[in-house]
């Protein structure tokens, strides 16, 4: 899994039936210091993540399976909304803090 920040939504009214009901988000991956990387991805979201939230993103075959719904044509799936990230030097992220 990777840390990412939600930058926005992607709307696609015409898509494969396997993606019906799956919200699509534009996410930017984060490094170990919480800084944005130059990598972006469109990820499916079934957990209800919102703009600017930090999320956990599963990629590859793990992204294609969720709750026994079979394979979905996804390379990335938001599988969790992050509340806090703590490292040896202290708090890296706290959802309650402003400015993130």
From Swiss-Prot:
Q: SUPFAM superfamilies this protein is in?
A: EutN/CcmL-like (SSF159133)
Instruction: Output the superkingdom of the source species.
Output: Bacteria
Q: Which residues constitute the signal peptide according to the record?
A: none
Q: Which UniProt keywords are listed?
A: Bacterial microcompartment, Carbon dioxide fixation, Carboxysome, Photosynthesis
Q: Which InterPro entries match?
A: CcmL, EutN_CcmL, EutN_CcmL_sf
All copies of domain BMV, residue ranges: 1-83
Q: Name one GO molecular function term.
A: structural constituent of carboxysome shell
Question: What subcellular locations does the record give?
Answer: Carboxysome
Record comment regarding domains: The tight homopentamer forms a pore with an opening of about 5 Angstroms in diameter which opens into a wider tunnel at the base of the truncated pyramid. The pore is positively charged.
Quaternary state and partners of this protein?
Answer: Homopentamer. Interacts with full-length CcmM.
Q: What PANTHER family has UniProt attached to this entry?
A: BACTERIAL MICROCOMPARTMENT SHELL VERTEX PROTEIN EUTN (PTHR36539:SF1), ETHANOLAMINE UTILIZATION PROTEIN EUTN (PTHR36539)
Role summary: Probably forms vertices in the carboxysome, a polyhedral inclusion where RuBisCO (ribulose bisphosphate carboxylase, rbcL-rbcS) is sequestered. Has been modeled to induce curvature upon insertion into an otherwise flat hexagonal molecular layer of CcmK subunits.
Protein name according to UniProt:
Carboxysome shell vertex protein CcmL
What gene is this protein translated from? Answer: ccmL
């Amino acid at each position: 899994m990777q840390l990412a920040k939600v930058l926005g939504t992607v709307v696609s009214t015409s898509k494969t039936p396997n993606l019906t009901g799956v919200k699509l988000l534009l996410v930017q991956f984060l490094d170990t210091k919480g800084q944005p990387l130059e990598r972006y991805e469109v990820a499916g979201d079934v957990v209800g993540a919102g703009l600017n939230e930090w999320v956990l993103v599963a990629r590859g075959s793990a992204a294609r399976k969720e709750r026994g719904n079979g394979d979905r044509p996804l390379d990335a799936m938001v599988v969790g909304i992050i509340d806090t990230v703590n490292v040896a030097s202290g708090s890296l992220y706290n959802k309650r803090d402003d400015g993130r």
